[in-house]
Amino acid sequence: MWMNFESLQIARAYLFGEVKYLDLMLVLNIIDIITGVIKAWKFKELRSRSAWFGYVRKMLSFLVVIVANAIDTIMDLNGVLTFATVLFYIANEGLSITENLAQIGVKIPAVITDRLHVIESDNDQKTEKDDQAAG
């Protein structure tokens, strides 16, 4: 079967723009899925339904990048919004992979785990403030 990769590149450029690190985001998504499955298998929590929803969430993150690219194009932001969105998802995947590896039993350097705790506590505080403001 012959595939026209030039057409794929055109579609990629149209949907995602010329954003950097999109390939890294894809690779980290795959690594996160693999480490998540290993973690779930280790703790005997491997469920096809919850895994399926996890995969859908991963795909939807690319949809968010497409929307960010559309907004970027309409507002003539030169790719800033799309780039920031991709960086957000890269950081999120990196954190998730690190958490999965730590729960599996892989030793993680203290600098990284300390930073994870700071980010996690910042997120918890923000969630509490949002809940108080809404309620």
From Swiss-Prot:
The keyword Cell inner membrane does not apply. It holds the Pfam family Phage_holin_4_1. Keywords: Cytolysis, Host cell lysis by virus, Host membrane, Membrane, Transmembrane, Transmembrane helix, Viral release from host cell. It is a multi-pass membrane protein. One of its GO terms (cellular component) is membrane. InterPro entries: Phage_holin_4_1 (IPR006480). It is found in: Host membrane. Signal peptide: none annotated. Coiled coil: none annotated. It comes from the Viruses. GO terms for biological process: killing of cells of another organism. The chain crosses the membrane at residues 24-41, 62-84. Produces a lesion in the cytoplasmic membrane allowing the phage lysosyme to attack the peptidoglycan. Belongs to the bacteriophage holin family. Cp-1 holin subfamily. This is Probable holin. It comes from Bacillus phage phi105 (Bacteriophage phi-105).
